[in-house]
Amino acid sequence: MGRPRTSQTRGQGPSGATGGNPRGGGSTTRERDARGARPGERDGGSEIQDRVVQIRRVAKVKKGGRRLNFSALVVVGDGQGRVGVGLGKANTVPAAIAKGQEKARHAMFDVPMRNTTIPHEVVGEYESSRVLLKPASEGTGVIAGGGVRAVLELAGIKDVLTKALGSTTPVNLVRATEDGLRQLRTKAQIEQIRGVKVRL
C-alpha cells in the first residue's frame, strides 16, 4: 500500500490564507458561503467573515531590476452591524491578504441600521468616487455590485439601493462606501445632535 497523499488548495499559503487572481477581481478557494464570504475568527460571539475584493500586482523598478509586490483589498464583517476595510501589501498574495485581513479587523466600526436597511440616505466620498446609499423596503435586496456589495453584505445590510458616481476604481468605491456607512446615524443620535424630534 502506498502512503496516503495530502492535498493543498491551490493558492493557499501555509497560514491558511488563500491566494487570489493576481490580475484582480474576487477572491478564490477555501470554504465560503453562497456569496463568496469566508468564515473567519469569532469576535464577541459573532463570526467574522472576510471577502477579498481585489488583488493587484505592482511592479517596482529598483537598482537590481523589477520587483513584484501584491496589494489585496479585503473587507471583513460579522453580518450583524460591524464591518471593516483593509489594504494589505506584500511580496506574495497570501501575505498581502493576511495583512489586509489584519488591517480590516482593526478598522472595524459599528453601522447603524433600521431593521434590514440603513436609517437614511447618505453619499459617501473618497477621492474622485462617490457612492449614493438609499434605504429600501424589506425584500429589495442589496442592489449594488463588486466591492460596494461586499461592504454592505458583510455589515449585515440586507436591503439597500446604491449608485456609483464618478470613478469606479474598486478601492475608491469600497472606501466611499465605508465613508457613507460611517456617516449614518440612528434616529436617536440625530435628535440628540439637533435637539429636536425628527422623522426618518
UniProtKB/Swiss-Prot annotation:
Residue ranges, compositional bias (Gly residues): 13-27
Family label: Belongs to the universal ribosomal protein uS5 family.
Residue ranges occupied by any S5 DRBM domain in the UniProt entry: 48-111
Domain free text: The N-terminal domain interacts with the head of the 30S subunit; the C-terminal domain interacts with the body and contacts protein S4. The interaction surface between S4 and S5 is involved in control of translational fidelity.
Protein name in UniProt: Small ribosomal subunit protein uS5
Biased composition (Basic and acidic residues): 29-49
Function: With S4 and S12 plays an important role in translational accuracy. Located at the back of the 30S subunit body where it stabilizes the conformation of the head with respect to the body.
Residue stretches of biased makeup (Polar residues): 1-12
Stretches the record annotates as Disordered: 1-49
GO molecular function, one term: rRNA binding
GO BP terms in the entry: translation
Subunit structure: Part of the 30S ribosomal subunit. Contacts proteins S4 and S8.
PANTHER family reported for this sequence: MITOCHONDRIAL RIBOSOMAL PROTEIN S5
The keyword rRNA-binding appears for this protein: yes
One term under GO cellular component: small ribosomal subunit
UniProt entry keywords in alphabetical sequence: Ribonucleoprotein, Ribosomal protein, RNA-binding, rRNA-binding
